[in-house]
Amino acid sequence: MSERDDNPVRSIQKAAQILDLIAEAKRPLSLTEIAEATGRAKSTVYGLLSSMRSVGFVEQNAETGRYELGVRLFEYGSAVQSTKNILELSREPMRALVTQTNESAALSMLDRGEVLILGHAEPDSSFHIVSETGRHLPSFCTAQGKVLLADLPTASVRRIFETHAQAYTPHTATSFDTLEAELKSVRERGYAIENGEFRVGIRGVAAPVYTHSGTVQYALGLIGMFRRIDSDEFRAATALVVKTAKALSEALGWRMK
């Protein structure tokens, strides 16, 4: 009987079993060892190993032919650890922002062209904006999204805009030129503003959180029912967000050049 199985879930499960086996062995394994340990035909195991090798999940020693875990998995692990670190680091600073402004704070990153809320903090007042962890928001018309887009190449921003653009309110930017000009301002001043572009009457501010490499990996922001973006209240909130984002960046190893 053939072991051929076109079910993608089953294929992933088989690949995961092999990765677990190599990890637990704590040494490179041969094709024969892997096939015997998993109870699968060598041809099936070889196909899975070849696929995983092509994407860097496993590496094959040119001299011995044995397989070991690839660098790509280390990169994924580092990314996960980085996210865990920033969530721990940002918890108290976000609470402090909420206490000082009585508005909602959120930490986010870019996920397939949209803003993904990683963590949030909300005031105790009855009237506040809810920022749900795990929720996706448009990137081109939110303060946090514009901060994240501002660090991307123009071609990447254009693709995201063309894929996701729509008019959420009368204030939403519906042309790429308008967005591009706004992102230029974001880079120059070091923060982004949201002025009723996603939800009428809702305003926000966000600043970039840099990693040790100098890239903008996260955005930290406040969102609420600020009366005006030119008010003393909003200017004070902006200064707090920028200061807090800078402190988080430094905690992640970033240093201003």
Segments from the language model and where they lie:
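N-terminal helix-turn-helix
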Residues: 1-88, 246-254
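A structural microfeature
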Residues: 56, 117-119, 218
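A structural signal for short hydrophobic beta-strand segments in well-ordered beta-sheet cores
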Residues: 58-60, 107-108, 209
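Amphipathic alpha-helical effector-binding/dimerization core
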Residues: 63-163
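Intrinsically disordered, acidic Ser/Thr/Pro-rich low-complexity regulatory segments
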Residues: 111-145, 172-207
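Cysteine/selenocysteine-centered motifs that mediate thiol-based redox chemistry or coordinate metal-sulfur cofactors
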Residues: 159-167, 245-257
